[in-house]
Each structure stands twice: as C-alpha cells, then as structure tokens.
C-alpha cells in the first residue's frame, strides 16, 4: 500500500512539475489624479480557473509559476478596481498591468440604476441590501416600519395595547436573529420588545438582511440570520437634512441631521429625532386605545477619524421614551379614572461605541477593535402587573486579519468578551443576573474571484452560567456560471433567554409566569441553500432568488400559554422543534424606470408544547408580496405600491376559557395595501401615502376587554393589524456640502 502511494506521488509530480516550470513576472499599477502610475500592493494575481496565485508586494511586483500550455489567462483583481485578464504567451518579458478604479461607475449605478432592494452579487453570504432609495418608498418612521416592501422579514404587533412590534425571520421570533448597528450587536435584553422603534428612519443609510448563520467573528448568538443597520456617516454629503412627518391619527415626527468636516482627518455628524402621538383613538369601540400615546426624544453624535495608519469611529446615543396605553377613560380627568386599566413604559437608554482599525505594512493586514456599552433603564406597569428592569451591557471584540501565501487565502482570528448585568423586578419577584462570556475565534477564507469562495469558522466561548460551548460555521459560494450563483451555509447558534424582557406582551394578560425548571441555553443548528439566477430578458436583467432554510433546535425555552388558563408555563424543550422556510423572489424592470418584485414564502414551523408536537402559534403559513415602483423621466415623480397577502396562523388554544371567549383555531387570510407618491425638487421632496388602505383590522383583538382585571383578560393573541387605514404626508429637505 505504501509503495502504491509513493508511486502515485512520484507520478503526480512528474506531470505537475513541468506545468509550472517557468515563471511570469510583472507589476500592477493604478493611476493617480495626475494620471501617474502608482504601485498597487496586495493585488490578487492568479491563473483563471485555478487556485494558483499570489499577491503583489509593496512595489506592485509579482512573480508566478507559468503553465506550459499557450494562451493561459492571468487574472488581476483588487477590491474597488475592475478586474483585468491578460492572455500570456511564452516570452520572458515583464508585464505591466494598470487597473482602472470602478468607484465612479459604481456610484452612478447605485444612484440611478441599482434596485432599491437586491441580493448582492459579490457577498459570500446571501445578503439583501435595502438601500436608502428602498427605505424612502414608504414612510419608514423607524426600523420596525422598514420592512413593508420586504418578503423576508415579517413585522407584527406583539399585543393590542402597547404598540410594540416584533420581527420574524425564517418563521421564527426576532430574538433568534442578531440585530446589529454597524456590525455591533444591539437591542438584546431589555430592548428586545421595543428596540425596533429606537432607530429613526432618517438616520439609516441602508439595512442588510442575511439569513442563516453568520460569521463567527460576529459572535455566537445568530441562529436564523442577521439584520444590520448602517447609519449615515459623518463624511457623507448631508450638510443639513430635515424630515417632517405627520398622519391623520395625530402622530407627528421631526428629524434633523447634519455632518460637519472638522479637519482633514476628523468628521462629525449630529442627529436629532422627536416624535409624539397624543390623540386617543378607539375605532373598534372596545374602550381600549388602538395605538398608544407616546413621546420619544432620540439624540446621536458620531465621529470619524481617518489617517494612513488608522481609522476610527466613535459615537454616543441617548433615548428617552414614554408610552402609554390601555382603556380610553383611564386618561380622562373623571373621578375613578385611575382605577381603570392603563399601561406605561418609561425608558432611558444610553449607548456608546468605538470602532478602531490599524493598517499594518503587510498588504491586506489589519487589526480591528470594537467596543460597545449600553445602559438601559425601564419602568413599567400593565394594569396590576408592575415590571422594572435595569441592564448594563458591555461588548468587546478584537480581530486580526492577514493572508497566507496570497490574498486568495485570508485568515482572521480574535477574542471577544460580553458582559451583561440584569436587575429585574416583576410584581413581588426579583430576578438578577451577572453573565460573563469570554471567547476566541478563528476563520479561514479561500477565495477564487468570480468562481468559488469558502468561509470556515469556529469559536469557543465560556459562559459563567452555562459553561464551555463551541460554535462551528461554514459558508460556500459557487458561481456555476456567470449568471448562476449557489450559496450554502451551515452552523450552530446559542443564546441566553431573557424570559420576561422578551415577552413583555404577555404582561397584558391576567396570567402569571411560572418557570418550571432551571432554564438551559437555547441552541440550534441552521442549514440553508440559496440559488440566484440572472436572466437577460428583452435587454434587461431579471433576477430570480430561490432558497430553503431549516432550523433544528437542540434546546429551546418554551413559552407555553396553552396548558393552563391561569399561568404561562416556561420550561426547556422536551421533544422536537424545527422551522423549514421556502422562498422564491423575482425582480425585473418591466419598462424603463418601473421595478417590479413578486415573492412568495412558505413556513413550516413546529414545536413541542407540553408533550405534543404542534404548529408554533402566530406564525403565518405563507406570505405573498407584490411591489411596483415607477419613476418618471428625470425622476420628477415616483409612485410606489405594495401588496401583502398574509396566510393563516394558528391561534393559541382558548378551549379552557368560557365559550364566549373562544377564538378560531386559525386566523383568516388577509391582504394589506400600501401606496406612496413622491414629488422631487432639487433640494426638496414631498411625499403623500397611505398604509393599510384596505382598512383591515383584527376583529376583537382583546379577550374580555370589559373586565381587564378579571381572570380571562388577554391582549396578546395578535395575528393582524390593530390600526386601520392611515394617511400620512411629509417633507424632506437636503442641503449638500459643496465638497467633503
């Protein structure tokens, strides 16, 4: 056997050595503003269709073994530049390659031609880019209202009283996806119920939605995917930006942004947001407010520093919010009004972050360090239920990245630390938690540009509450053809359940929480396939995206409100729990300046509640989406129209309640229509729109609203809209810097 292996090695080398017996040498340059050649260090140089390659040195020089056959194609690539392909013969002359920057071309395409929401062609992980143009197709007052034109993310009310909204990704609650702001984990813990409303729409530059497991360098928590928000940058062109909004329900908002160039190396930006709703509205006459009344003040200051050896971003945010709901007469001045049912949530939140990067002499080599601190103080009551929470959160992530042999092989390694302190009080029960999680990770990327990419990562973390655990993850991207891209992912995620904070909507019931046992960490595997096909149709490109994702829980914390009419039982999973999600989406420019998207998603989500495997409650079986966006010539007007068809979802069982409080087993199918018209001027934009134009609302969303302190009161079985049609109008003003 050993002789055969030795013979095979010798025979293989006899064939391989002559193939790379000669060398090709050359230089790679770019042109500066004066059209003079400048060396381009770290450029990728490789033979087309192979993994044989190298990287240019600090002088732009490269040397590479050359195949013996004629007409071999040498590919030169560099991020931010257009690839060049050179046909090599057997002469011994040195090559000179000048790469052209594609920055100008990309800027034009993004501003004028790129769709508002699209799957990035170049990203390893299937990532939907929701651009600023897409965000402007609806009112988009905050992050929770930014997915109206998106098929992947569902946003629903979590109860009929507080106005809180929750997202679902891959058919599962948003707590299983990782919410980030500029790739920093955010809105976990006490912010999980209302955090989506803490990001004003006017602050956002773009949103990235990726499904399945993420990179290990972002942590261990992501199970179903990531939603990352990019704020507007201090170095952008917005000298002054103002957005004013109001609707017929009495909600008004004001936003102001300004970026300032302090010095050649320093830029800063300030953001301000104020919103208010004080009108009492009860359209369904159940004596409960359809929308809460609230006031929010939100401030943000960020800085950007850039030099040849270092780049840094720093910021501080502060939020103060007070929202109230409950019975309409609770807010009257009549005697005894305060004996009625009311809710109040007071929130003070402070965030501070820093992101610093250090560029080393070796090409494509850097050190990055991210730090974040969050203070969150919440004081609430829901009728007779009183809940107070305090959280201190600290996150630190140190990363080193370089390449091995050439830039086709990149290695990233680092260490992270997460600290969470919780002090919670629910009625007469106190809960506190100190959690420390140090961890290390490494990640390897193998990239054959325009053909194949592999990302393999693993991290090891130690939690002082749950011990040691390992998180492996794998991503693949293969260009089957230039028009067909296949992506695959697999990996595991883990998270600590925050039972009360993540389920504040259940405090709008008469039931009491009962935690039956010591709760384990939630853990799950996620697997996914994503296929993108581009088709040239009538001179325009149609994109078709088809995907399948499966989530298998190893352990899940079950919130069971179906096996006791008096209690909400909380316990670890004992059985199966999984989610299968299938989605197809087609996008096409039907006629010039008219973009059309048609999508359909099917959810198969099952969990073991008690000892029975059943459909997870309040998850739509399917969703259909149809959007049309048309801009007139020279973009003087824009018309946007969105239709959502929401399939049935299982309603938690009400069989243990008196017959008059029974609800149907499944919700009906319903349709939502949204539309907006925008008029553009040089510095001004005026918009007029309508939400829920079908005026569809959930019938009788509250069980026993006439006796809110009685044993059957429940405002948490929400599957549809609570508010009817809303007409809104607004104005945007933009004054740009002449030059930054």
Where are these regions (language model features)?
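Flexible loop and strand-edge segments within Gram-negative outer membrane beta-barrel domains
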Residues: 277-298, 306-367, 373-391
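Membrane-embedded beta-barrel scaffold of Gram-negative outer-membrane proteins
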Residues: 368-380, 479, 487, 520-572, ...
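Extracytoplasmic beta-strand/coil segments of soluble accessory domains associated
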Residues: 144-185
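N-terminal periplasmic accessory domains that precede
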Residues: 92-98, 143-146, 165-168, 195-200, ...
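Short, acidic, small-residue-rich periplasmic hinge/interaction motif at the N-terminus
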Residues: 32-36, 41-48, 77-81, 91-136, ...
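Short acidic/polar hinge/loop motifs at secondary-structure boundaries
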Residues: 62-65, 184-211, 299, 516
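Gram-negative outer-membrane beta-barrel transporters
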Residues: 447-449, 548-552, 572-654, 732-739
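C-terminal beta-signal and adjacent terminal beta-strands/loops
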Residues: 494-495, 596, 645-654, 678-740
């Amino acid at each position: 056997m050993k002789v055969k292996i030795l013979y095979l090695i010798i025979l293989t080398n006899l064939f391989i050595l002559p193939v790379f017996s000669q060398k090709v040498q050359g230089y790679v340059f770019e042109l500066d503003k004066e059209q003079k050649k400048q060396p381009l260090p770290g450029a990728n140089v490789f033979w087309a269709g192979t993994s044989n390659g190298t990287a240019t040195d600090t002088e732009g020089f490269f040397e590479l073994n050359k195949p013996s056959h004629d007409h071999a194609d040498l590919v030169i690539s560099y991020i931010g530049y257009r690839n060049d392909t050179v046909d090599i013969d057997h002469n011994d002359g040195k090559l000179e390659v000048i790469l052209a920057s594609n920055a100008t071309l990309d800027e034009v395409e993004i501003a004028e031609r790129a769709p508002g929401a699209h799957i990035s062609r170049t990203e390893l992980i299937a990532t939907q880019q929701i651009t600023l143009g897409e965000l402007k197709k609806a009112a988009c007052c905050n992050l929770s209202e930014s997915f109206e034109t998106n098929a992947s993310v569902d946003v629903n009310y979590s109860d009929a009283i507080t106005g809180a909204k929750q997202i679902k990704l891959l058919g599962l609650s948003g707590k299983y996806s990782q919410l980030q702001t500029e790739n920093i984990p955010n809105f976990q813990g006490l912010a999980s119920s209302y955090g989506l409303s803490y990001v004003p729409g006017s602050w956002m530059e773009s949103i990235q939605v990726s499904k399945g497991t993420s990179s290990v360098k972002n942590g261990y928590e992501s199970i179903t995917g990531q939603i990352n928000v990019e704020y507007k940058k201090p170095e952008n062109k917005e000298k002054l930006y103002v957005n004013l909004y109001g609707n017929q329900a009495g909600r008004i908002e004001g936003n102001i942004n300004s970026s300032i160039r302090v010095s050649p190396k320093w830029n800063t930006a300030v953001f301000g947001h104020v919103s208010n709703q004080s009108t009492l509205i009860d359209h369904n006459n159940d004596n409960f407010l359809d929308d809460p009344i609230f006031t929010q003040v939100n401030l943000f200051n960020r800085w950007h520093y850039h030099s040849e050896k270092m780049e840094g971003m720093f910021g501080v945010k502060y939020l103060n919010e007070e929202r109230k709901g409950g019975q309409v007469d609770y807010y009257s001045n009549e005697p005894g009004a305060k004996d009625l049912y009311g809710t109040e949530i007071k929130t003070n939140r402070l965030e501070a972050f820093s992101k610093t990067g250090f560029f080393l002499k070796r090409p494509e080599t850097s050190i990055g360090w991210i730090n974040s601190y969050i203070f969150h103080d919440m004081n609430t009551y829901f009728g007779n239920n009183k809940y107070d929470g305090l959280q201190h959160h600290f996150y630190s992530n140190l990363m080193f990245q370089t390449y091995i042999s050439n830039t086709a092989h990149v290695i990233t390694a680092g260490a992270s630390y997460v600290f969470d302190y919780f002090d919670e009080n629910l009625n007469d029960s106190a809960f506190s938690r100190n959690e420390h999680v140090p961890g290390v990770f490494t990640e390897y990327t193998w990239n054959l540009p325009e053909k194949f990419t592999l990302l393999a990562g693993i991290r090891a973390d130690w939690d002082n509450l749950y011990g040691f655990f390992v998180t492996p993850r794998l991503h693949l991207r293969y260009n089957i053809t230039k028009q067909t891209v296949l992506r695959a992912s697999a990996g595991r995620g883990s998270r600590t359940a925050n039972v009360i904070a993540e389920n504040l909507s259940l405090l709008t019931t008469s039931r009491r929480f009962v935690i039956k046992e010591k709760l384990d960490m939630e853990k799950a595997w996620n697997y996914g396939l994503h296929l993108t096909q581009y088709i040239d149709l009538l001179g325009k490109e149609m994109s078709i995206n088809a995907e399948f994702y499966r989530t298998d829980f190893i352990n899940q914390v079950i919130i069971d409100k179906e096996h006791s009419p008096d209690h909400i039982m909380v316990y670890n999973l004992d059985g199966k729990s999984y989610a299968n999600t299938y989605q197809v989406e087609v996008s096409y420019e039907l006629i010039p300046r008219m973009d059309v998207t048609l999508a359909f998603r099917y959810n198969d989500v099952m969990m073991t509640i008690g000892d029975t495997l059943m459909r997870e409650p309040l998850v739509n079986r399917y969703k259909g989406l149809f959007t049309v966006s048309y801009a007139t010539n020279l973009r003087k007007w824009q018309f946007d129209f969105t239709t959502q068809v929401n399939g049935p979802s299982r309603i938690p069982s009400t069989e243990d309640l008196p017959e008059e409080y029974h609800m149907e087993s499944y919700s009906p199918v319903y349709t939502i229509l949204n539309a907006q018209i925008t008029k553009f001027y040089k510095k001004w934009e005026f918009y007029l729109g309508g939400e829920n134009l079908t005026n569809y609302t959930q019938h009788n969303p509250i069980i026993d609203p006439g006796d809110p302190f009685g044993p059957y009161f429940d405002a948490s079985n929400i599957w549809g809209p609570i508010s009817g049609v809303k007409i809104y109008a607004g104005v945007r003003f933009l004054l740009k810097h002449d030059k930054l």
